[in-house]
Amino acid sequence: MSYFEHIPEIRYEGPQSDNPLAYRHYDKSKKVLGKTLEEHLRIAVCYWHTFVWPGVDIFGQGTFRRPWQQAGDAMERARQKADSAFEFFSKLGTPYYTFHDTDVSPEGSSLKEYSENFLRITDYLARKQEDTGIKLLWGTANLFSHPRYAAGAATSPDPEVFAFAATQVRHALDATQRLGGDNYVLWGGREGYDTLLNTDLMRERDQLARFLHMVVDHAHKIGFKGSLLIEPKPQEPTKHQYDYDVATVHGFLLQHGLEKEIRVNIEANHATLAGHSFHHEIATAYALGIFGSVDANRGDPQNGWDTDQFPNSVEELTLAFYEILKHGGFTTGGMNFDSKVRRQSVDPEDLFYGHIGAIDNLALAVERAAVLIENDRLDQFKRQRYAGWDADFGRKILSGDYSLSTLATDALARGLNPQHASGHQELMENIVNQAIYSGR
């Protein structure tokens, strides 16, 4: 059965095309800085928003009537969901996908049933991957939707909940390994608190650290060669989450000896919820040595929650890719669309429109970021701005040759009277805009 029979394969037709079911900028074989756009982007489509979400919100019921969600038997629905997903991936021409365990497989009424269902669906997904050549960017476990996780999973006050969550992660990590996934993601959706009045903060942080060590140990045990990634988010659904932002995650990893084992998966909308730019979080992750992968989406500046809209700002994406390309590009990570169509976008075509537009925006951003790297004007100015630190005096300060006292004595002896030099922010912004809008 075809779920998108009337939709053709999406192909590149160039900027002049008026075909809404074609790429205008994403020519996957086009080379930029020595790699194809497909290699730079490593695009993935997520299972949950695209094939699971029924179009509900807190004020209304689901608006979507997806044909793959109609079968009476839960396992048959799971197989139909996989059929529709891989047909979609194939027509869109995207090389990767991502999932939560309960996106792809029915949870069942017991842990035993959950495990059996998941094993069977993993085999089914393996066959779909073999038939299509589509690969798994990352897998994860849903440790936030079921009522048992209302007070958290690893941070739950109930050790039985912790154990249930550990079982899910064990199976999800095993499935990711079985399917050749490049990463495994840990999103602490309810690893946080709603009020400190009933929360033992230190205990919960220790529990979370123990859980992460168990995950790392299991990954080593099964020979998982991919990256383990935490996805930071400041709040929602809890008031405060322990993986607030990239810097917070890094501090937690350092505290618990995990900084060499786990990196971050950065979501654009989570960055803005934390009061940061997408650019900031990516740059911070690279500065701290924990950059892993990206969830591509955007929020609404007028809304204080995670709207998971498709990314449509080439300006924002260019700055993100400027950081990524400067550091050599993705290794195991990629660009996963943690994005969903709006509740009113009920036609099957809308799923394609959202992804096509976003993929075109990513392609443009890679090309514009490459211009910034090739003309080198931003980095050239930075090198000039910090040149004093590369000279003898600056190097001696950083190498520890001076104490606070001897540096003060030297400053007095030199009669230092430094004058401020312009930061040229406006010029830097003009250089970025010239690259984006003029391509040079």
UniProtKB/Swiss-Prot annotation:
**Biological process GO terms, please?**
D-xylose metabolic process
Entry's localization field: Cytoplasm
Q: Name one GO cellular component term.
A: cytoplasm
Q: Name one GO molecular function term.
A: magnesium ion binding
User: What's the superkingdom here?
Assistant: Bacteria
Could you say which residues bind Mg(2+) 2 here?
Answer: 267, 270, 306, 308
Q: Active site at which residues?
A: 100, 103
For whether the record's keyword set contains Repeat, the answer is no
Give the matching InterPro entries.
Xyl_isomerase-like_sf, Xyl_isomerase-like_TIM-brl, Xylose_isom_bac, Xylose_isomerase
Q: List the disulfide bonds.
A: none
Keyword Isomerase assigned: yes
- Main localization is cytoplasm
Which keywords annotate this record?
Answer: Carbohydrate metabolism, Cytoplasm, Isomerase, Magnesium, Metal-binding, Xylose metabolism
Q: Which cofactor does it need?
A: Mg(2+)
Record: residues binding Mg(2+) 1: 231, 267, 295, 338
Which Pfam families does this chain map to? AP_endonuc_2
As recorded in UniProt, its EC number(s) are 5.3.1.5
**Assembly with partners or alone:** Homotetramer.
What the entry lists under PANTHER family is as follows: PTHR48408, XYLOSE ISOMERASE (PTHR48408:SF1)
Entry-linked HAMAP family: Xylose_isom_A
Family membership noted in the UniProt record:
Belongs to the xylose isomerase family.
Protein's recorded name: Xylose isomerase
Source organism of this protein record: Paraburkholderia xenovorans (strain LB400)
